[in-house]
UniProtKB/Swiss-Prot annotation:
<dbReference type="GO" id="GO:0071944">
    <property type="term" value="C:cell periphery"/>
</dbReference>
<dbReference type="GO" id="GO:0005576">
    <property type="term" value="C:extracellular region"/>
</dbReference>
<protein>
    <recommendedName>
        <fullName>Cell wall protein SRL1</fullName>
    </recommendedName>
</protein>
<dbReference type="GO" id="GO:0031505">
    <property type="term" value="P:fungal-type cell wall organization"/>
</dbReference>
<comment type="function">
    <text>Required to stabilize the cell wall in the absence of multiple GPI-anchored mannoproteins.</text>
</comment>
<dbReference type="GO" id="GO:0000324">
    <property type="term" value="C:fungal-type vacuole"/>
</dbReference>
<dbReference type="GO" id="GO:0009986">
    <property type="term" value="C:cell surface"/>
</dbReference>
<feature type="compositionally biased region" description="Low complexity">
    <location>
        <begin position="118"/>
        <end position="127"/>
    </location>
</feature>
<feature type="glycosylation site" description="N-linked (GlcNAc...) asparagine">
    <location>
        <position position="23"/>
    </location>
</feature>
<keyword id="KW-0961">Cell wall biogenesis/degradation</keyword>
<dbReference type="GO" id="GO:0005934">
    <property type="term" value="C:cellular bud tip"/>
</dbReference>
<feature type="glycosylation site" description="N-linked (GlcNAc...) asparagine">
    <location>
        <position position="174"/>
    </location>
</feature>
<feature type="glycosylation site" description="N-linked (GlcNAc...) asparagine">
    <location>
        <position position="200"/>
    </location>
</feature>
<feature type="compositionally biased region" description="Basic and acidic residues">
    <location>
        <begin position="132"/>
        <end position="141"/>
    </location>
</feature>
<keyword id="KW-0325">Glycoprotein</keyword>
<feature type="glycosylation site" description="N-linked (GlcNAc...) asparagine">
    <location>
        <position position="206"/>
    </location>
</feature>
<dbReference type="GO" id="GO:0009277">
    <property type="term" value="C:fungal-type cell wall"/>
</dbReference>
Length: 210
């Protein structure tokens, strides 16, 4: 009999404990309305040289989307449990996520001055019939391009050939002085008694200076 009472008491305690920790799940969907921010940023770049000046203006629009930082769930569900020994209530949990999305749109505006292009092509006037090897040459101008802001420089090349020139040079030598050295070696030869002949052995050295 005592064992039956103890078993019944344990069974009642176990059912009470299980009732305390039992719960239910309720699904709830909440739509969050996002907000956005539009931030324009303008940038201007300029270019200038001797004949041209223009500006490049660009505007970048940045759009940021933001979800709400808080959410309210109105249909909160609760579940009441009761047993012989305990009772409780269940409060559902809610979560939300914040998402930020940026959209960049670029607009490029390029403004240039109006320009007019001219492309003439003609033959240059012939040169005069003077002593020149190029008198029959045909010189054609390069294509030209000009704008309202200035002209484009044009380069022409002309080949000139010189006539051969002959020059005569007269060379007059300076007056020169020549010296002659005579060296004699006297000797006496007797051909016969009473006759004596004299003669010289002479060498001439000629030196010339300019």
């Amino acid at each position: 009999m005592l064992q039956s009472v103890v078993f019944f008491a344990l069974l009642t305690f176990a059912s009470s404990v299980s009732a305390i920790y039992s719960n239910n799940t309720v699904s709830t969907t909440t739509t969050l309305a996002p907000s956005y921010s539009l931030v324009p940023q303008e940038t201007t770049i300029s270019y200038a040289d001797d004949t041209t000046t223009f500006f490049v203006t660009s505007t970048v629009y940045s759009t940021s989307w933001f979800t709400s930082t808080s959410a309210t769930i109105t249909n909160a569900a609760s579940s009441s449990l009761s047993t012989s020994s305990a009772s409780g209530s269940v409060t559902p949990e809610s979560t939300h996520e914040i998402t930020s999305t940026s959209t960049i749109t670029s607009t490029l505006l390029l403004t240039l001055h109006d320009s007019t292009t001219l492309s003439p092509s003609s033959t240059a006037a012939s040169v005069s019939d003077e002593d020149s090897n190029n008198k029959d040459a045909k010189v054609k101008s390069f294509e030209q391009a000009s704008t309202s802001n200035g002209c484009v420089p044009i380069t022409k090349f002309v080949t000139v050939t010189n006539e051969p020139v002959t020059q005569y040079v007269t060379v007059t030598p300076n007056t020169t002085t020549q010296y002659v050295t005579v060296t004699g070696a006297p000797s006496v030869t007797t051909t016969s008694p009473g006759n004596v002949q004299w003669y010289n052995t002479t060498s001439i050295t000629n030196s010339t200076s300019w």
